[in-house]
């Protein structure tokens, strides 16, 4: 009798059912005929299924484009009251508009969080972030040049703000 695993495999269709013959009861044909090699038929050519045109998963994004160096027509000044105002800053900076951020109406924790966001934004879009006063920052795109000197007191203020 076959083992239970073999029976289960046959039941599930994972193996062919083999008849268990005792050695003395084998069919006469198998004893008389010599083993012959059966020629393997050539594989039939498979028809190529028509494929549908491929559509890209990701649409071309305008967020990675660099702002075109154009004539500067405006500078945006933002007085954020909460972190959610960062979206306005990001949208305008992405368009190539320099943004002045006045943090005087924000708490220190929210101001730090917004400056961290603005720093990442400026680095990601190859811009620059500069401190103008203790709570005012300038985000300038890569095509905008800002000139001026940084005094010793401004350097101390910058160190005290970021050194917390």
Swiss-Prot record:
It comes from Clavibacter michiganensis subsp. michiganensis (strain NCPPB 382). Its main location: cytoplasm. Residues 22-54 have a biased composition (Low complexity). One of its GO terms (cellular component) is cytoplasm. The keyword Cell cycle applies. Cell division protein that is part of the divisome complex and is recruited early to the Z-ring. Probably stimulates Z-ring formation, perhaps through the cross-linking of FtsZ protofilaments. Its function overlaps with FtsA. This is Cell division protein SepF. It is found in: Cytoplasm. Homodimer. Interacts with FtsZ. One of its GO terms (biological process) is division septum assembly. Residues 21-71 are annotated as: Disordered. Pfam families: SepF. InterPro entries: Cell_div_SepF, Cell_div_SepF/SepF-rel, SepF-like_sf. Belongs to the SepF family. Keywords: Cell cycle, Cell division, Cytoplasm, Septation. It comes from the Bacteria. Disulfide bonds: none annotated.
């Amino acid at each position: 009798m076959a083992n239970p695993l073999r029976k289960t495999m046959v039941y599930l269709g994972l193996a062919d059912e083999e008849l268990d013959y005792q050695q003395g009861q084998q069919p006469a044909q198998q004893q008389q005929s010599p083993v012959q090699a059966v020629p393997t038929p050539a594989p039939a050519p498979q028809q190529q299924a028509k494929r549908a045109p491929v559509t890209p998963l990701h649409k071309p994004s305008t967020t990675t484009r660099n702002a075109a160096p154009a004539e500067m027509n405006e500078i945006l000044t933002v007085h954020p009251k909460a972190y959610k105002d960062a979206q306005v800053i990001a949208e305008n900076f992405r368009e190539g508009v320099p943004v002045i951020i006045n943090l005087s109406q924000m708490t220190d924790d929210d101001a730090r969080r917004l400056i961290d966001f603005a720093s990442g934004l400026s680095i990601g879009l190859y811009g620059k972030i500069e401190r103008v006063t203790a709570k005012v920052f300038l985000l300038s795109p890569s095509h905008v040049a800002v000139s001026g000197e940084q005094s010793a007191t401004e350097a101390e203020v910058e160190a005290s703000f970021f050194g917390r």
